[in-house]
């Protein structure tokens, strides 16, 4: 009787211990999955292009090209020497894929938006606000042909001052005539649409010339074409305003 009772107790303990081990394995598995997911986020999505090693401001863990410390998961500052192409993790090239830029921007902004850091440390909140603003600037610059070209010149230490007149007289005459056409289309929807289409074609051709110039490392040619793009972009903005005033819908 006593032996039977001991056996039953031993069996029950073994069953309980077995269940405990199963639960422990299950919890460990979940924990491992969580770490794997966090690592995937850190290594695949939340990275920028940099060769400079850094240390986490929160725990001093060494990391490289990661927005979140892989040790304590705290948001990190970006190195100051990064350009907009580095920030979005794309190759420095005038020819870009706007869809790729948009996807990367959305992924990063979704993780870096200040609303995500309401309950975090004050420094982390400030970093979030700074990075989110920087990301907006990078996106608006690289998705705009003129801004992208001017920014690439800026990276080479070249700028085009506002109000520059270093363009040939024939081109200035051409721009004056275009502006007169815009002025004469104030109440003419069809003319506004036609002028917008023509201007779009001109800007597209100029953009291709800029791409060729940068591809050939000809910054003087790129600068000359970008100056022309500035004038035609100004005309484009006037036509867009007219289009809105006249209630023209695409």
Stretches found by the model and what they are:
Residues 2-250:
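C-terminal accessory/regulatory regions appended to core domains
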């Amino acid at each position: 009787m006593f032996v039977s009772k001991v056996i039953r107790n031993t069996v029950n303990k073994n069953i309980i211990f077995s269940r405990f081990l199963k639960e422990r394995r299950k919890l460990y598995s979940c924990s491992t999955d969580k770490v794997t997911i966090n690592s995937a986020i850190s290594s695949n999505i939340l990275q920028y292009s940099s060769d400079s090693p850094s240390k986490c401001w929160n725990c001093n863990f060494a990391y490289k090209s990661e927005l979140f410390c892989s040790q304590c998961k705290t948001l990190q500052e970006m190195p100051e020497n990064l350009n907009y192409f580095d920030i979005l993790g794309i190759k420095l090239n005038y020819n870009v894929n706007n869809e790729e830029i948009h996807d990367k921007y959305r992924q990063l902004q979704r993780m870096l938006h200040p609303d995500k850091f309401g309950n975090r440390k004050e420094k982390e909140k400030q970093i979030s606000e700074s990075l989110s603003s920087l990301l907006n600037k990078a996106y608006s610059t690289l998705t705009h042909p003129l801004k992208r070209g001017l920014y690439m010149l800026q990276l080479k230490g070249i700028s085009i001052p506002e109000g520059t007149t270093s363009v040939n007289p024939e081109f200035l005459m051409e721009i004056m005539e275009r502006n007169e056409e815009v002025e004469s289309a104030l109440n003419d929807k069809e003319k506004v649409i036609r002028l917008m289409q023509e201007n779009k074609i001109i800007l597209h051709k100029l953009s291709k010339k800029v791409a060729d110039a940068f591809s050939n490392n000809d910054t003087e040619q790129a600068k000359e074409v970008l100056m022309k793009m500035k004038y035609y972009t100004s005309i484009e903005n006037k036509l867009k305003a007219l289009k809105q005033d006249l209630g023209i819908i695409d």
